[in-house]
């Protein structure tokens, strides 16, 4: 967790002061924090707790080193600090903990070494012990802003027989720049920090009771003459927290507690990437996979039943193997889930547009988007496979029905992408139909008849492509909106192929959302035509080509989505809400 935990104290002589703070370091340690220690000067006490290796380093400094370190420190000068304002001795390099799991270091000093962090901690300390306090001056509170960070502060009192009111004022603060994370960590921080405070108060109370038993101070103070001038009682108005708790290892224990607090608080909340609801393409693919699994299970069951029946083999049938013919449904599902191999041919839509030419590509793309049958006739099976692989990216998965290569013509209701060998005849009424486009691939007589000068691929330069249709798309026809946007993306050379692919995905999602709205409006709610026209105008799809595209894409909606809509509308709760 990227935060700073600090212990603050309100000194009677100097006001709010930071006593001890622990910060998280993801980068190498700063100079002066446990660096340059020789074996003779360093005492290391290491222990394992919660996956953190605790290391406390103490070294003896010469007076010159102490003076230089004091002048370079962003904290207050020695002359501005009393015993109650100081935690670590002069020259103490602080405490360091190494987290072996994450390679993170937790470093504790009296003040942060970075000037900006020192300013943030200093301001939070002053506010926590002056204006930002809860009623009763003891308890948790939250404050902060985007510039100076957000602070969780818990103020508390420590018993002191020599202090005014027999107690001194402290606070433990946790500073973060992430407001939401800090608020969500409030229950955890509150429970753990209260545990630390209770332990400190229990130790101080034992010392307080011992001092009161040995030399009661209340009667002595009541008998003392009143004076308007501030003065030190018994010559020791400022006492350190170690003397108040009688614990010489107090700062090492606080470092351990603060380091564990930072590690545990950062581990309990993690960020997860939420991908949202599955798209229609994902739902359709899942349905097709489920259908294939069902079909394979049915085939396995039928084979098992045939084996149990154990039919007697008739004479003359030996040596012959009978194979079952796949049903039409299995054939269609196999066509829908067909995955072509990655072979040479068309690389992308931009590649195909450059090879076919802009007019021919626009005609072909228009028929693809409208749901018309696209027939490729070529002897090169790999070329047909690559063409279908590229063209199918313009359609939702549910609208794609492919027969990659057939020895006979297949009707349009069975497939909208059909690959044929050149000798296969196509019926005359199909060739004259406005709902069919045919791409014939011939061998070019000269290599420069139809060069494929794109993407350094000359494998298509030996072919000549002829695109024909019974209803050619006029050059001045507006066409569907998505086709114009696709062409604009393909002609923009500043966009790479990967960017164009992502743009195509976004366009399909945009228009599939319009399809869902139209399906709900017309099929589920059964609205009149006048309302449907108004809806199409709102969706920006009132043109004829856009309407045809929406109706075709409606066939690609998943069964899951359709059944969910129908069950929601027909449920009693939905009926009551509509009424």
Swiss-Prot record:
Record's compositionally biased regions (Acidic residues): 294-308
Record domain dDENN FLCN/SMCR8-type: where = 493-558
Write down the position(s) of the site called Essential for GTPase activation (GAP) activity. Answer: 164
- Gene deletion effect: Embryonic lethality at 5.5-6.5 dpc, showing defects in the visceral endoderm. Heterozygous knockout mice appear normal at birth but develop kidney cysts and solid tumors as they age, probably caused by activation of the mTOR pathway. Conditional deletion in kidney leads to development of polycystic kidneys and renal neoplasia, caused by activation of the mTOR pathway. Mice lacking Tfeb and Flcn in the kidney do not show any abnormality in the kidney, suggesting that the kidney phenotype observed in Flcn knockout mice is due to constitutive activation of Tfeb.
- Limits of the cDENN FLCN/SMCR8-type domain: 339-491
The cross-references to Pfam families, in alphabetical order and at most eight, read: Folliculin, Folliculin_C
Describe the location of the uDENN FLCN/SMCR8-type domain by residue ranges. 86-242
Q: Where is this region: Disordered?
A: 31-82, 294-323
* Ways its activity is controlled: GTPase-activating activity is inhibited in the folliculin complex (LFC), which stabilizes the GDP-bound state of RagA/RRAGA (or RagB/RRAGB), because Arg-164 is located far from the RagC/RRAGC or RagD/RRAGD nucleotide pocket. Disassembly of the LFC complex upon amino acid restimulation liberates the GTPase-activating activity.
Q: What is its main location?
A: membrane
Tell me which UniProt keywords the record has, alphabetically.
Answer: Cell projection, Coiled coil, Cytoplasm, Cytoskeleton, GTPase activation, Lysosome, Membrane, Nucleus, Phosphoprotein, Tumor suppressor
> Gene Ontology cellular component?
cell-cell contact zone; centrosome; cilium; cytoplasm; cytosol; FNIP-folliculin RagC/D GAP; lysosomal membrane; midbody
Q: Where is the composition biased (Low complexity)?
A: 63-76
Could you tell me the Gene Ontology terms of the biological process aspect for this record? cell proliferation involved in kidney development; cell-cell junction assembly; cellular response to amino acid starvation; cellular response to starvation; energy homeostasis; epithelial cell proliferation; ERK1 and ERK2 cascade; hemopoiesis
Name its cellular compartments.
Lysosome membrane; Cytoplasm, Cytosol; Cell projection, Cilium; Cytoplasm, Cytoskeleton, Microtubule organizing center, Centrosome
Q: Which GO terms describe its molecular function?
A: enzyme binding; enzyme inhibitor activity; GTPase activator activity; protein-containing complex binding
Q: How is it modified after translation?
A: Phosphorylation by ULK1 modulates the interaction with GABARAP and is required to regulate autophagy.
Post-translational modification Phosphoserine, affected residues: 62, 73, 302, 406, 537, 542, 571
Q: What does this protein do?
A: Multi-functional protein, involved in both the cellular response to amino acid availability and in the regulation of glycolysis. GTPase-activating protein that plays a key role in the cellular response to amino acid availability through regulation of the non-canonical mTORC1 signaling cascade controlling the MiT/TFE factors TFEB and TFE3. Activates mTORC1 by acting as a GTPase-activating protein: specifically stimulates GTP hydrolysis by RagC/RRAGC or RagD/RRAGD, promoting the conversion to the GDP-bound state of RagC/RRAGC or RagD/RRAGD, and thereby activating the kinase activity of mTORC1.
Assembly and binders: Interacts (via C-terminus) with FNIP1 or FNIP2 (via C-terminus). Component of the lysosomal folliculin complex (LFC), composed of FLCN, FNIP1 (or FNIP2), RagA/RRAGA or RagB/RRAGB GDP-bound, RagC/RRAGC or RagD/RRAGD GTP-bound, and Ragulator. Interaction with FNIP1 or FNIP2 mediates indirect interaction with the PRKAA1, PRKAB1 and PRKAG1 subunits of 5'-AMP-activated protein kinase (AMPK). Interacts with HSP90AA1 in the presence of FNIP1. Interacts with HSP70, STUB1, CDC37, AHSA1, CCT2, STIP1, PTGES3 and PPP5C.
The entry sums up its family as follows: Belongs to the folliculin family.
Q: What is this protein called?
A: Folliculin
Organism for this UniProt entry: Mus musculus
């Amino acid at each position: 967790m990227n935060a700073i935990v600090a212990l603050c104290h309100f000194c009677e002589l100097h006001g709010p002061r930071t006593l001890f703070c622990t910060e998280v370091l993801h980068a190498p340690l700063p100079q002066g924090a446990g660096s340059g220690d020789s074996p003779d000067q360093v005492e290391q006490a290491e222990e394992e707790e919660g996956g953190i290796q605790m290391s406390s380093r103490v070294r003896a400094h010469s007076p010159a080193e102490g003076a230089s370190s004091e002048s370079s420190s962003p904290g207050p000068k020695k002359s501005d600090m009393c015993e109650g304002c100081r935690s670590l001795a002069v020259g103490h390099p602080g405490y360091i903990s190494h987290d072996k799991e994450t390679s993170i270091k937790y470093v504790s000093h009296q003040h942060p070494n970075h000037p900006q962090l020192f300013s943030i901690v200093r301001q939070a300390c002053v506010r926590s012990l002056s204006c930002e306090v809860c009623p009763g001056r003891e308890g948790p509170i939250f404050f902060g802003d985007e510039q100076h960070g957000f602070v969780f502060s818990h103020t508390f009192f420590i018993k002191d027989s020599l202090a005014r009111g027999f107690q001194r004022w402290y606070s433990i603060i946790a500073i973060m720049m992430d407001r939401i994370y800090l608020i969500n960590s409030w229950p955890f921080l509150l429970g753990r920090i209260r545990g630390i405070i209770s332990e400190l108060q229990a130790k101080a109370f034992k010392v307080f009771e011992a001092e009161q038993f040995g030399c009661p101070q209340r009667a002595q103070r009541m008998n003392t003459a009143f004076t308007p001038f501030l003065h030190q009682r018994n010559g020791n108005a400022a006492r350190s927290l170690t003397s108040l708790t009688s614990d010489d290892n107090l700062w090492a224990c606080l470092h351990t507690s603060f380091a564990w607090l930072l590690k545990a608080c950062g581990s309990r909340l993690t960020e997860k990437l939420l991908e949202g609801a599955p798209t229609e393409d994902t739902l359709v693919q899942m349905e097709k996979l489920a259908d294939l699994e069902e079909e394979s299970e049915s085939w396995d069951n039928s084979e098992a039943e045939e084996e149990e029946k154990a039919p007697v083999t008739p004479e003359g049938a030996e040596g012959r193997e009978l194979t079952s013919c796949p049903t039409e449904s299995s054939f269609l599902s196999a066509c829908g889930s067909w995955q072509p191999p990655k072979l040479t041919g068309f690389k992308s839509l931009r590649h195909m547009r450059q090879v076919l030419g802009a007019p021919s590509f626009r005609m072909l793309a228009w028929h693809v988007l409208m749901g018309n049958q696209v027939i490729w006739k070529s002897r090169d099976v790999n070329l047909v496979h690559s063409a279908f692989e590229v063209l199918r990216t313009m359609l939702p998965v549910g609208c794609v029905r492919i027969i990659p290569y057939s020895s006979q013509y297949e009707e349009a209701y069975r497939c909208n992408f059909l690959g044929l060998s050149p000798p296969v005849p196509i019926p005359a009424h199909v060739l004259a139909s406005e709902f069919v486009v045919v791409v014939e691939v011939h061998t070019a007589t000269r290599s420069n008849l139809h060069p494929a000068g794109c993407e350094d691929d000359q494998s298509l330069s030996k072919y000549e492509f002829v695109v024909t249709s019974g209803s050619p798309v006029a050059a001045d026809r507006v066409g569907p909106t998505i086709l114009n946007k696709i062409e604009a993306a393909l002609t923009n050379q500043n966009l790479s192929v990967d960017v164009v692919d992502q743009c195509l995905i976004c366009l399909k999602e945009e228009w599939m959302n319009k399809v869902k709205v139209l399906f709900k409006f017309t099929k589920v709610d059964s609205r009149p035509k006048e309302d449907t026209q108004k809806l199409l105008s709102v969706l920006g799809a009132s043109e004829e080509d856009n309407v045809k595209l929406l109706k075709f894409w409606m066939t690609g909606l998943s069964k899951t989505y359709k059944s969910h809509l129908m069950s929601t509308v027909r449920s009693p709760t939905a009926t009551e809400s509509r009424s």
